Amino acid sequence: MPQNPERTVDHVDLFKQPEYTELFENKRKNFEGAHPPEEVERVSEWTKSWDYREKNFAREALTVNPAKGCQPVGAMFAALGFEGTLPFVQGSQGCVAYFRTHLSRHYKEPCSAVSSSMTEDAAVFGGLNNMIEGMQVSYQLYKPKMIAVCTTCMAEVIGDDLGAFITNSKNAGSIPQDFPVPFAHTPSFVGSHITGYDNMMKGILSNLTEGKKKATSNGKINFIPGFDTYVGNNRELKRMMGVMGVDYTILSDSSDYFDSPNMGEYEMYPGGTKLEDAADSINAKATVALQAYTTPKTREYIKTQWKQETQVLRPFGVKGTDEFLTAVSELTGKAIPEELEIERGRLVDAITDSYAWIHGKKFAIYGDPDLIISITSFLLEMGAEPVHILCNNGDDTFKKEMEAILAASPFGKEAKVWIQKDLWHFRSLLFTEPVDFFIGNSYGKYLWRDTSIPMVRIGYPLFDRHHLHRYSTLGYQGGLNILNWVVNTLLDEMDRSTNITGKTDISFDLIR
């Protein structure tokens, strides 16, 4: 079909045209050596069986779609939440292009980071010269206020010593001696993106706060969001603390960086936590982490080196937000204002409106440990019944915490927690023990296609939908958003399953 410049056909419609369908069929028949359709269908059906599930869960040396990213992604994300900070990755350009692209495709925003451009020679002899030259170019060309260094597999395998390399770069005159260059070793072959976040956060805080301890507290509360990719959450946190009159510092605030306005002029480093505020965080009254499993090393460092009180509070749903606000009130002496109590009432009222559609519904969820705990806890409040909980980057500590939450609810008795399993395992679970809906990131759309189970997109990354990252998921307002996504996904599916005229449309109701 010839294209008309007045109406260009996009790929969705273009590849449905007869010439393309014929092309694809000939390609399969003459060049791919494909199995007959009947055999493909037979094997496909077998992969949905209990027999295949047992074989699937017995595999040891293969991972299929792991539902996690590698350490440098988390390290870059943590660094970009600080004012004027340029992530510098000691490794190859291809790896850094992946990290940047992964974040850019989620946020639909540019993501600035540089690479030391290590190639074959650096893989053998080390990347010292790459760093010396890269530091000079980065400092002079991009004019950052801080450069945060992390590593890829190549640099870790050869054993690059970041601390020594940075010192040599300063001695060589690439950057000033007093210029802040925190670093973190982030090997991609261990841990995940949440490990990289923790390593970089500890590296940045230890660098900026060195020698800044004072005899008296500044009276502030530090908040560490963790690997939380919803920019609306930091804004909601700031709004709630503003309403309470709490003096605070968010350690790594990337909300303006990944949701910057289009004002007609390019700004390379929008927003971020002020470096002087981060440096003074050592003198705060307490530090509250909103995620536990993205901050273990950072919290241990703050507790032992800063001698500062640390807490983990997850302000999700009614109960979680209640506990968070109560704890902040006790730490600061500030009362919880009526405005937030009214918001709580709105969430309770909304739950009452939608409760009947969620209560008793079985669901499955995969994602990062803290996200799973927060979302599952909120859904348990509404009587939803988890069946499959899968966390590839979860550990035994997470499993015990999650199982304790499930055991404390009458709706969590049938759930099973799977750690260090991937999305191909999740597929077997959905086929052998179906649920009413499942929750996950964009990679779950292939499971939605295979199983026809309704999917609620919550998590990271969200590549195939726009603007979801702008919403909040924490606090009472965030609870409304989660409730909205879940209940309306269920109602959409109800309409789809009752839309056949004269057969199922007796329940195709106008009012739900």
Swiss-Prot record:
Report the family membership. Answer: Belongs to the NifD/NifK/NifE/NifN family.
PROSITE patterns with a match to the protein in the record: NITROGENASE_1_2 (PS00090)
Recite the UniProt keywords alphabetically.
Answer: ATP-binding, Iron, Iron-sulfur, Metal-binding, Nitrogen fixation, Nucleotide-binding, Oxidoreductase
The name under which this protein is listed is Nitrogenase molybdenum-iron protein beta chain
Entries under Pfam families matching the protein: DUF3364, Oxidored_nitro
Gene behind this protein = nifK
- What is the role of this chain? This molybdenum-iron protein is part of the nitrogenase complex that catalyzes the key enzymatic reactions in nitrogen fixation.
Q: What class of enzyme is it?
A: oxidoreductase
The EC number(s) given in the record are 1.18.6.1
The UniProt GO MF terms for this protein read: ATP binding; iron-sulfur cluster binding; metal ion binding; nitrogenase activity
Residues binding [8Fe-7S] cluster: 70, 95, 153, 188
- Subunit comment: Tetramer of two alpha and two beta chains. Forms complex with the iron protein (nitrogenase component 2).
Q: Which reaction does it catalyse?
A: N2 + 8 reduced [2Fe-2S]-[ferredoxin] + 16 ATP + 16 H2O = H2 + 8 oxidized [2Fe-2S]-[ferredoxin] + 2 NH4(+) + 16 ADP + 16 phosphate + 6 H(+)
Q: GO cellular component annotations, sorted alphabetically?
A: molybdenum-iron nitrogenase complex
What species is given as this protein's source?
Nostoc sp. (strain PCC 7120 / SAG 25.82 / UTEX 2576)
How is the cofactor bound here?
Answer: Binds 1 [8Fe-7S] cluster per heterodimer.
Cofactor(s) required for function per UniProt: [8Fe-7S] cluster
